[in-house]
Protein backbone atom coordinates (compact mmCIF):
# COMPACT_ATOMS: atom_id res chain seq x y z
CA UNK A 1 0.00 0.00 0.00
CA UNK A 2 1.46 3.37 -0.97
CA UNK A 3 0.20 5.06 2.20
CA UNK A 4 2.21 2.72 4.37
CA UNK A 5 5.38 3.31 2.36
CA UNK A 6 5.23 7.05 3.05
CA UNK A 7 5.30 6.53 6.83
CA UNK A 8 8.82 7.02 8.13
CA UNK A 9 10.12 5.67 11.40
CA UNK A 10 11.65 7.92 14.06
CA UNK A 11 15.41 8.18 14.62
CA UNK A 12 15.11 6.33 17.94
CA UNK A 13 13.50 3.35 16.20
CA UNK A 14 16.23 3.36 13.57
CA UNK A 15 18.94 3.36 16.23
CA UNK A 16 17.32 0.46 18.07
CA UNK A 17 16.99 -1.53 14.85
CA UNK A 18 20.61 -0.92 13.82
CA UNK A 19 22.27 -2.08 17.01
CA UNK A 20 21.91 -2.02 20.74
CA UNK A 21 24.93 0.27 21.26
CA UNK A 22 24.91 4.06 21.07
CA UNK A 23 26.29 5.71 17.93
CA UNK A 24 29.40 7.90 18.29
CA UNK A 25 28.97 11.67 18.66
CA UNK A 26 29.29 13.85 15.59
CA UNK A 27 30.48 17.43 15.07
CA UNK A 28 29.51 19.70 12.17
CA UNK A 29 31.21 23.08 11.77
CA UNK A 30 29.62 25.55 9.35
CA UNK A 31 28.72 29.26 9.21
CA UNK A 32 30.70 30.04 12.35
CA UNK A 33 28.82 27.49 14.44
CA UNK A 34 29.66 24.03 15.72
CA UNK A 35 26.82 21.52 16.12
CA UNK A 36 27.64 18.58 18.43
CA UNK A 37 25.27 15.60 18.37
CA UNK A 38 25.53 12.81 20.92
CA UNK A 39 23.37 9.95 22.17
CA UNK A 40 22.89 8.75 25.73
CA UNK A 41 20.46 7.02 28.08
CA UNK A 42 18.20 9.07 30.31
CA UNK A 43 17.01 8.20 33.81
CA UNK A 44 14.21 6.04 32.34
CA UNK A 45 16.80 3.94 30.48
CA UNK A 46 15.69 5.32 27.14
CA UNK A 47 17.94 6.50 24.37
CA UNK A 48 17.91 10.25 23.83
CA UNK A 49 19.58 12.50 21.33
CA UNK A 50 21.33 15.63 22.60
CA UNK A 51 22.21 18.40 20.13
CA UNK A 52 24.41 21.29 21.30
CA UNK A 53 25.10 24.34 19.16
CA UNK A 54 28.20 26.45 19.87
CA UNK A 55 29.08 29.81 18.40
CA UNK A 56 32.69 29.96 17.30
CA UNK A 57 34.52 33.14 18.34
CA UNK A 58 38.17 34.07 18.00
CA UNK A 59 39.93 35.56 20.99
CA UNK A 60 43.44 36.91 21.39
CA UNK A 61 45.00 35.00 24.29
CA UNK A 62 48.50 35.03 25.74
CA UNK A 63 51.08 32.84 24.08
CA UNK A 64 51.34 30.60 27.14
CA UNK A 65 47.57 29.93 27.08
CA UNK A 66 47.60 29.03 23.38
CA UNK A 67 50.57 26.73 23.91
CA UNK A 68 48.87 25.01 26.85
CA UNK A 69 45.79 24.23 24.72
CA UNK A 70 47.97 22.25 22.29
CA UNK A 71 49.40 19.96 24.94
CA UNK A 72 49.09 16.22 24.23
CA UNK A 73 46.07 14.74 25.99
CA UNK A 74 46.09 11.42 27.83
CA UNK A 75 43.71 8.86 29.32
CA UNK A 76 40.17 8.85 27.97
CA UNK A 77 40.89 12.09 26.07
CA UNK A 78 44.04 10.86 24.29
CA UNK A 79 42.48 11.14 20.82
CA UNK A 80 40.44 14.30 21.40
CA UNK A 81 40.92 17.57 19.55
CA UNK A 82 42.16 20.73 21.26
CA UNK A 83 39.60 22.08 23.68
CA UNK A 84 37.34 20.48 26.27
CA UNK A 85 35.42 17.32 25.42
CA UNK A 86 31.89 17.32 26.92
CA UNK A 87 32.08 13.57 27.49
CA UNK A 88 35.15 13.74 29.71
CA UNK A 89 35.30 17.40 30.77
CA UNK A 90 32.69 19.42 32.62
CA UNK A 91 33.10 23.18 32.10
CA UNK A 92 31.56 25.06 35.00
CA UNK A 93 30.74 28.73 35.31
CA UNK A 94 33.45 31.31 35.88
CA UNK A 95 33.94 32.15 39.54
CA UNK A 96 35.26 35.64 40.27
CA UNK A 97 37.24 36.09 43.46
CA UNK A 98 36.86 39.12 45.67
CA UNK A 99 39.60 39.78 48.21
CA UNK A 100 38.28 41.21 51.48
CA UNK A 101 40.82 43.05 53.61
CA UNK A 102 40.79 43.56 57.35
CA UNK A 103 38.91 46.79 58.00
CA UNK A 104 40.23 47.12 61.54
CA UNK A 105 43.87 47.22 60.39
CA UNK A 106 43.02 49.76 57.68
CA UNK A 107 41.22 51.92 60.24
CA UNK A 108 44.25 51.82 62.58
CA UNK A 109 46.62 52.87 59.78
CA UNK A 110 44.25 55.67 58.74
CA UNK A 111 44.08 56.97 62.32
CA UNK A 112 47.88 57.03 62.54
CA UNK A 113 48.12 58.98 59.28
CA UNK A 114 45.42 61.42 60.40
CA UNK A 115 47.32 62.16 63.60
CA UNK A 116 50.41 63.03 61.56
CA UNK A 117 48.38 65.23 59.21
CA UNK A 118 47.25 67.34 62.16
CA UNK A 119 50.88 68.08 63.01
CA UNK A 120 51.88 69.38 59.58
CA UNK A 121 50.71 72.94 58.93
CA UNK A 122 52.57 75.44 56.78
CA UNK A 123 53.24 78.80 58.46
CA UNK A 124 53.39 80.51 55.02
CA UNK A 125 50.17 79.39 53.31
CA UNK A 126 48.66 77.43 56.25
CA UNK A 127 48.39 74.28 54.13
CA UNK A 128 48.70 70.68 55.33
CA UNK A 129 52.43 70.39 54.65
CA UNK A 130 55.72 71.50 56.20
CA UNK A 131 57.03 75.01 55.59
CA UNK A 132 60.23 73.71 53.94
CA UNK A 133 58.05 72.00 51.30
CA UNK A 134 55.80 75.01 50.66
CA UNK A 135 55.68 76.05 46.96
CA UNK A 136 55.39 79.72 48.03
CA UNK A 137 58.60 79.67 50.10
CA UNK A 138 60.97 82.44 49.01
CA UNK A 139 58.36 84.13 46.78
CA UNK A 140 56.57 87.46 47.02
CA UNK A 141 53.65 85.72 48.71
CA UNK A 142 55.82 84.96 51.74
CA UNK A 143 57.37 88.45 51.77
CA UNK A 144 54.01 90.23 51.52
CA UNK A 145 52.26 88.18 54.18
CA UNK A 146 52.00 90.27 57.32
CA UNK A 147 52.67 88.64 60.62
CA UNK A 148 49.94 89.25 63.22
CA UNK A 149 51.00 91.14 66.31
CA UNK A 150 50.20 89.14 69.45
CA UNK A 151 47.82 90.87 71.84
CA UNK A 152 49.08 91.93 75.22
CA UNK A 153 48.23 89.35 77.83
CA UNK A 154 46.70 90.65 81.06
CA UNK A 155 48.70 90.18 84.17
CA UNK A 156 47.72 87.13 86.13
CA UNK A 157 46.10 87.68 89.49
CA UNK A 158 48.19 84.87 90.89
CA UNK A 159 51.49 86.64 90.16
CA UNK A 160 53.91 86.61 93.07
CA UNK A 161 54.10 89.75 95.18
CA UNK A 162 57.35 91.68 94.82
CA UNK A 163 59.11 91.70 98.18
CA UNK A 164 62.09 93.85 97.26
CA UNK A 165 64.55 91.00 97.83
CA UNK A 166 66.91 89.83 95.09
CA UNK A 167 65.81 86.57 93.50
CA UNK A 168 68.32 84.65 91.31
CA UNK A 169 67.24 84.09 87.69
CA UNK A 170 67.20 80.34 88.25
CA UNK A 171 64.61 80.75 91.03
CA UNK A 172 62.34 83.36 89.38
CA UNK A 173 60.24 80.82 87.49
CA UNK A 174 57.88 78.79 89.68
CA UNK A 175 58.63 75.64 87.68
CA UNK A 176 62.38 76.13 88.00
CA UNK A 177 62.09 76.87 91.70
CA UNK A 178 60.69 73.40 92.29
CA UNK A 179 63.85 71.88 90.80
CA UNK A 180 66.19 72.75 93.64
CA UNK A 181 68.11 69.49 93.23
CA UNK A 182 69.27 70.51 89.73
CA UNK A 183 72.29 72.83 90.06
CA UNK A 184 71.56 74.41 86.65
CA UNK A 185 67.90 75.01 87.48
CA UNK A 186 66.41 73.11 84.51
CA UNK A 187 64.30 69.99 84.17
CA UNK A 188 65.82 67.53 81.69
CA UNK A 189 63.14 64.91 82.29
CA UNK A 190 60.82 66.62 79.79
CA UNK A 191 63.48 67.24 77.13
CA UNK A 192 63.76 65.31 73.87
CA UNK A 193 66.52 65.16 71.28
CA UNK A 194 65.59 65.33 67.59
CA UNK A 195 68.34 64.21 65.22
CA UNK A 196 68.81 63.63 61.49
CA UNK A 197 67.58 67.12 60.63
CA UNK A 198 68.45 68.80 57.34
CA UNK A 199 70.92 71.68 57.07
CA UNK A 200 68.11 74.03 55.99
CA UNK A 201 66.28 73.56 59.30
CA UNK A 202 65.44 76.79 61.13
CA UNK A 203 64.07 77.65 64.55
CA UNK A 204 60.72 78.52 62.99
CA UNK A 205 60.54 75.11 61.31
CA UNK A 206 61.43 73.39 64.58
CA UNK A 207 58.72 75.31 66.44
CA UNK A 208 56.19 74.41 63.75
CA UNK A 209 57.16 70.76 64.08
CA UNK A 210 56.42 70.50 67.81
CA UNK A 211 53.96 73.29 68.61
CA UNK A 212 50.84 71.17 67.93
CA UNK A 213 51.99 68.37 70.22
CA UNK A 214 52.03 70.45 73.37
CA UNK A 215 53.42 73.60 74.99
CA UNK A 216 57.18 73.82 75.35
CA UNK A 217 59.39 76.04 77.45
CA UNK A 218 62.64 76.06 75.50
CA UNK A 219 64.15 74.96 72.18
CA UNK A 220 67.73 74.71 71.00
CA UNK A 221 68.80 74.17 67.39
CA UNK A 222 72.49 73.30 67.04
CA UNK A 223 74.17 75.42 64.33
CA UNK A 224 77.65 75.50 62.88
CA UNK A 225 79.63 78.55 64.03
CA UNK A 226 81.20 79.20 60.62
CA UNK A 227 78.43 78.39 58.14
CA UNK A 228 75.40 78.97 60.36
CA UNK A 229 73.75 75.80 59.05
CA UNK A 230 72.01 73.26 61.20
CA UNK A 231 74.25 70.52 62.59
CA UNK A 232 71.47 67.96 62.30
CA UNK A 233 70.06 67.85 65.84
CA UNK A 234 67.99 69.93 68.24
CA UNK A 235 66.61 69.84 71.80
CA UNK A 236 63.06 70.66 72.85
CA UNK A 237 61.93 71.07 76.48
CA UNK A 238 58.21 70.45 76.94
CA UNK A 239 56.24 71.63 79.94
CA UNK A 240 54.94 68.14 80.67
CA UNK A 241 56.52 64.73 80.35
CA UNK A 242 53.35 63.35 78.74
CA UNK A 243 53.69 65.78 75.81
CA UNK A 244 57.33 64.80 75.43
CA UNK A 245 56.39 61.11 75.27
CA UNK A 246 53.72 61.91 72.67
CA UNK A 247 56.27 63.78 70.57
CA UNK A 248 58.62 60.78 70.61
CA UNK A 249 55.80 58.44 69.62
CA UNK A 250 54.60 60.60 66.71
CA UNK A 251 57.84 62.03 65.34
CA UNK A 252 60.25 59.11 65.74
CA UNK A 253 60.62 57.51 62.30
CA UNK A 254 58.52 60.23 60.65
CA UNK A 255 59.66 61.64 57.30
CA UNK A 256 60.55 65.35 57.28
CA UNK A 257 62.27 67.20 54.43
CA UNK A 258 63.19 63.90 52.70
CA UNK A 259 64.83 62.59 55.91
CA UNK A 260 63.69 60.15 58.61
CA UNK A 261 63.69 61.79 62.04
CA UNK A 262 65.19 60.09 65.08
CA UNK A 263 63.56 61.30 68.31
CA UNK A 264 64.57 60.09 71.77
CA UNK A 265 64.77 61.25 75.37
CA UNK A 266 67.52 63.74 76.07
CA UNK A 267 70.30 62.30 78.21
CA UNK A 268 71.04 64.52 81.24
CA UNK A 269 74.46 66.14 81.25
CA UNK A 270 76.78 65.69 84.22
CA UNK A 271 77.16 68.96 86.13
CA UNK A 272 80.62 70.44 85.99
Curated annotation (Swiss-Prot):
GO molecular function terms listed in the Swiss-Prot or TrEMBL record: RNA binding; translation initiation factor activity
Region Disordered: start-end pairs: 1-28, 143-187
GO cellular component terms, A-Z: eukaryotic 43S preinitiation complex; eukaryotic 48S preinitiation complex; eukaryotic translation initiation factor 3 complex
SUPFAM superfamilies according to UniProt: RNA-binding domain, RBD
SMART domains attached to this UniProt entry: RRM
Pfam families: eIF3g (PF12353), RRM_1 (PF00076)
Domain RRM: 190-268
Function recorded in the entry: RNA-binding component of the eukaryotic translation initiation factor 3 (eIF-3) complex, which is involved in protein synthesis of a specialized repertoire of mRNAs and, together with other initiation factors, stimulates binding of mRNA and methionyl-tRNAi to the 40S ribosome. The eIF-3 complex specifically targets and initiates translation of a subset of mRNAs involved in cell proliferation. This subunit can bind 18S rRNA.
UniProt-listed HAMAP family: eIF3g (MF_03006)
Assembly description: Component of the eukaryotic translation initiation factor 3 (eIF-3) complex.
UniProt record similarity statement: Belongs to the eIF-3 subunit G family.
Name used for this protein in its record: Eukaryotic translation initiation factor 3 subunit G
Organism: Culex quinquefasciatus (Southern house mosquito)
Gene: eIF3-S4
Amino acid sequence: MPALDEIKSSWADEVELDSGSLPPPTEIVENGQKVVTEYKYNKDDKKVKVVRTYKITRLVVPKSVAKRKNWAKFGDSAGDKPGPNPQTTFVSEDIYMQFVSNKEEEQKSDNALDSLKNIAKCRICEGEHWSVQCPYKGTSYEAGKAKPVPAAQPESSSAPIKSGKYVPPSMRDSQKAALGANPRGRDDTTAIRISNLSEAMTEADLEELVKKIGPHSKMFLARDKNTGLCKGFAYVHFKSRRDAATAIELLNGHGYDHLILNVEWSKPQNPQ
